[in-house]
Amino acid sequence: MTERTFSIIKPDATRRNLTGAINAVIEAAGLRIVAQRRVKLTEAQAKKFYEVHAERPFYGELVGQMTAEPVVVQVLQGDNAVLKYREVMGATNPENADEGTIRKLFALSIGENSVHGSDSLENAGIEIAQFFTEDEIVG
């Protein structure tokens, strides 16, 4: 089933000019990038996006990291896009990620793990709508 999912290429990766390399891994996995934009998140945007983690001890650091430098927000499309992208990203901790995954290839640490991907189809819709209108998605 064709789905859409949301991706963020995080500051640790954009700082190292890895957007193209990460996009190549995404596309090699059969996912299409149907919307993409480089943005600098405001504190309010980052807090809203990560509000599910608001009570966690790493929340403040996460918001700080995500607003420090630009990110690349994306909409990815393909068969079973949510699950496929989660597989392509690899485990949150790059030490546990499978070879060839984005996090194994590019992440610096569990905190600087290069990418975010939606964890469900429902959340993908919510996350996409925070950054893109339907007219901006060309698929």
Curated annotation (Swiss-Prot):
PANTHER family: NUCLEOSIDE DIPHOSPHATE KINASE, NUCLEOSIDE DIPHOSPHATE KINASE DDB_G0292928-RELATED. One of its GO terms (molecular function) is metal ion binding. Its EC number is 2.7.4.6. GO terms for biological process: CTP biosynthetic process; GTP biosynthetic process; UTP biosynthetic process. It comes from the Bacteria. Its main location: cytoplasm. The keyword Endoplasmic reticulum does not apply. The keyword ATP-binding applies. Pfam families: NDK (PF00334). The gene is ndk. Keywords: ATP-binding, Cytoplasm, Kinase, Magnesium, Metal-binding, Nucleotide metabolism, Nucleotide-binding, Phosphoprotein, Transferase. Its cofactor is Mg(2+). Major role in the synthesis of nucleoside triphosphates other than ATP. The ATP gamma phosphate is transferred to the NDP beta phosphate via a ping-pong mechanism, using a phosphorylated active-site intermediate. Belongs to the NDK family. ATP binds at K10, F58, R86, T92, R103, N113. InterPro entries: NDK-like_dom, NDK-like_dom_sf, Nucleoside_diP_kinase, Nucleoside_diP_kinase_AS. This is Nucleoside diphosphate kinase. It is found in: Cytoplasm.
